[in-house]
Structures are given as C-alpha cells and as structure tokens.
From Swiss-Prot:
SUPFAM superfamilies: DAK1/DegV-like (SSF82549). This is DegV domain-containing protein SpyM3_0586. PROSITE patterns: DEGV. Pfam families: DegV. It comes from the Bacteria. It comes from Streptococcus pyogenes serotype M3 (strain ATCC BAA-595 / MGAS315). May bind long-chain fatty acids, such as palmitate, and may play a role in lipid transport or fatty acid metabolism. Residues 3-280 form the DegV domain. The keyword Manganese does not apply. Coiled coil: none annotated. PANTHER family: DEGV DOMAIN-CONTAINING PROTEIN DR_1986-RELATED, FATTY ACID-BINDING PROTEIN TM_1468. Hexadecanoate binds at residues 61, 94.
C-alpha cells in the first residue's frame, strides 16, 4: 500500500509534516475587498490582520478548488499511490467535504476515503500526522480508517470569541445567538458539536469567568483518558498565556501545544479568539 494524505490549509502542521512527500495540502482562498489571497503564498498572517483591520468589510473565504483536488488525485495515481485519505475542514462549517464524495467514482484505480474530520486547526493536523504514522507502522487501510474514526469521535474544540459578528456574517452562527450575546455583554463559549458545527455551548458573564469555565470544561473532558491538548488563538497571545497558566494551576501536567489560527479560520472567528482543542492519544 502506498498511501497519500490530503488536507487543507486550515490544518496546523509542523514543518517536517509540511515537507513530507506523502502529504498534500489544498489552499483555501481568503477574499478581502474583492482580492483573492492564499495564506503562505501571497498572504502572511500579519498581513491578513492588517488587511482585515483596514477593510470596511469582513473578509470572506471560499472552498478549495474541486478541479485542483481532481487533478491531484490523477497525479497521485500516476505516481503509484494506491490509497488516499483526505482530511479537510469540518463538514459542519464547509460544504467542501460533502462536495468531494463523488471523486471516488472518478478515480476507481485508487482506494480513497474522505471521512468528515468535524474539526480544524491543531486537532486536524494531529489526525493527518497519525494517519501517516499508522500507515508507516504497517497498518491496513481499513485499520487506519477505524483508528481515525476513533480519533474523530473523541476530538472537539471549545472557543471564546471577541466579536460574534464574524461568525454570523460567515454563516457559521445564527444572528439570534450573536444578538443575545452582544446585548447582554455575554461571552458565549462555543464548541464544535458532533456534526462538526460551531454551536453555543454556554453563556458566561465576563471574559475572566469564561476563561476559568474553559479550564473547567477541559478538565472534565480529559478526566477519563489520555488526550493531547492544544491552545489556539487568533492574535491573542495574552489570552493564550493566561489560559495556559490557568490550566497548569489546575493541575494539568502534560505538554500543551500552542498555535495560532490561520487566516481562513481567523476570518470567521475574528481577532482575539481563544480556543482549546482536545484529541485522544491513540
């Protein structure tokens, strides 16, 4: 079995994985004032925040190119790849996952699977890494898919944002939920639910209380087993440091990965968002 893993630019990948010849990534366009950008190609994360601040309109995102994925699958076939696993941004907040299912029929020479990751960022990157590791350990394609589904089912993320309007205008949250939060000065805690949608989990008064509540939620989640925890933020280093300190003060003694959201996710969460991702160690 020669396996390739395809993901998208919302997955947080360390440098060694980005350079791995068996991993391929599709760029997701970010549109600012009718100009199209691709993070890492013609848009740095600092440039993104500056352009977002300067623009009168919120940025938008589009889906990765279907034709690019179709062409990539043809290329992988010509290079002798026999199996492909695609792991992309949660189907609950992007239509891309649903739109690509037909491609398996277009490339019958490759055995492929596109499970819904139901997540993004660091947990998505963890899934990509695990799939590659399991393949190189000699696991069968079906065994990898079974293990991957176990990770997907045990993975989630909780988020606190500064401005709910980004989620509303991006179609990721209802206007009613945002209106309530803004009117009452509430800091809603959001989560990725079982369908990969971003939903309101709890409403908490004040940011400080919301941060402490995030730690309580996290400790409850990881009490029953071994998990990798990541703190993810959109230009909110002070909040990330504070959340990490609260977590360590609560007794958490394991390593905590700290990363920032890329431009695509920051488009929908806005500047100042803080989150933690939880995924099982398998």
């Amino acid at each position: 079995m020669k396996l390739a893993v395809i993901t998208d630019s919302t997955a947080t990948l360390p440098i060694d994985l980005k350079q791995d010849k068996a991993i391929f990534s599709l760029d997701i366009p970010v549109i600012i004032d009718d100009e199209t950008y691709f993070e890492g190609r013609n848009l740095s994360i600092d440039d993104f925040y500056q352009k977002m601040a300067d623009s009168k309109n919120l940025p938008k995102t589009s889906q990765p190119s279907l034709s690019e994925l179709d062409n990539l699958l043809g290329l992988l076939s010509s290079k002798g790849y026999t199996h492909v696993i695609g792991l992309f941004l949660a189907g609950g907040i992007s239509g891309f996952w649903q739109n690509i299912q037909f491609l398996a029929e277009e490339h019958p020479e490759i055995e492929m699977a596109f499970p819904d990751s139901k997540i993004t960022s660091a947990p998505l990157g963890s899934m990509v890494k695990n799939v590659l590791d399991w393949s190189r350990q000699g696991m069968t394609f079906q065994a990898i898919l079974n293990k991957l589904q176990e990770q997907i089912d045990g993975t989630t993320a909780f988020i606190m944002v500064d401005d709910l309007n980004h989620l509303v205008k991006g179609g990721r949250l209802s206007n009613g939920s945002a209106l309530l939060g803004n009117l009452l000065s509430i800091k809603p805690i959001l989560r990725f639910d079982e369908e990969g949608k971003i939903v309101v989990y709890e409403k908490v008064r004040t940011e400080k209380k919301a941060m402490k509540r995030l730690v309580e939620i996290l400790n409850d989640l990881i009490a029953d087993g071994q998990y990798n925890v990541s703190i993810i933020h959109s230009k909110a280093q002070d909040k990330a440091d504070y959340l990490k300190r609260l977590l360590q003060d609560s007794g958490y003694q394991y390593d905590i990965e700290e990363v920032h959201f890329g431009a695509v996710i920051a488009t929908h969460l806005g500047e100042g968002a803080i989150a933690f991702g939880v995924t099982p160690r398998l």
